[in-house]
Amino acid sequence: MSLLLGVTSCHWFNPDDEVVYDRTVLAYIAAENSLSYGAFHEQDIDEMLQAAGDIPANSRLLIYLDDTSNPRILSIEQQSGRRPTSRVVHEYSEEQNSGDVETLRTVMEWVCDHYPSSSYGLIFWSHGDAWLPAKAVPQRSICIDNGRNNYSNSGSKMDIADVADVLDGFPCLEFILFDACFMQAVEVAYELRHVTRHVIASPAEIPNPGAPYERMVKPFFSVPFDGAEVVEQYYRMYNDSVISVFGYGSDRYGVSLSVIDCSRLDALADATAEMVTKYVSRDEATDLKGIQRYYPLSSKSRPEFYDMNGYMRRLIKDEADYVRWKSVFDLAVPYARSTAWWYSNDAYTQRVDLDNYGGVSCYVPQDRSIYDGLNEKFRTTSWYVAAGWQEVGW
């Protein structure tokens, strides 16, 4: 189900640079947090090993692994007639903070120096909280590092804007996959639009088992890159199988996903700004009751993550205007899938409004007397200006 998507403003290697591999995919696994306690990183590495035979001969799948041992870089390999292995190709002599963008920078430098490639993919594996600043509550945006503590989630974390600044110094990525909660937010993708062609993620929480890598390694290396197939394989694992939260009972995991074509995000910002400036009142917040929201169950009142299509459908009063906006949205989000429910906070499932599901979340500025702190944080995003919110005084 290949999608021929547009071209971003990404930059590339100088043509004189040596290119050895067709594509190198790096999984940046920041596991010094509660996910390590559950050994979920080990399960996912095992899944990658199962799919080692799907890695093309002239491509590489690397893992930067920071768990409770010293950080190291692994190469997933399968030699003819032998079992797949995760070979250590680089080991760090001391502890690193994987929730620091400088660590991301040094890892990317090492990978690009030692595996020069025509294209790259990047997987962020950890906890995530979309566009919220790293100093906001809860205290993370992407990749928590608690040192050698694997019981909690209170350690260092990276702001998405800082991640974008670091990645801007490297060859344009073919894709970024967030195997982390809440990261398919339009504010996140817009921040990353110059450093990657595609963003694949969930607007909601990700179930503990995460991505089914044994299904997804093959499309990671597709040419042209097939982001829709990555989404489809991820979705199918949860839709086609009954995976019970406890191993018994009716509670079962679900997942919501989409792929964003970053070359279309400026057009989406323009179309959204047109509608925001036409339909948003400077003095009265939009009625948000009944619009699909994504949240941890323990924080059900959090208003950060509304389904973008659901919100815009409510906001735009003229059907012709909505159809026009939706046509731009569909180019920016060419493929989205969701089970009938989405997973939340270990043991609960929430129904998905499939009729209005867009697969991408957005923040909507709200009552200043209650949410002005969140509104203020939203004003620090690039999307706030691009999508017209500054112009209407929110």
Where are these regions (language model features)?
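Surface-exposed loop and adjacent secondary-structure segments within mature catalytic domains
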Residues: 66-89, 119, 124-150
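N-terminal extension/subdomain marker
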Residues: 11-116, 384
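Gly/Ser/Thr-rich loops at beta-strand to alpha-helix junctions
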Residues: 32-34, 126-132, 181-185
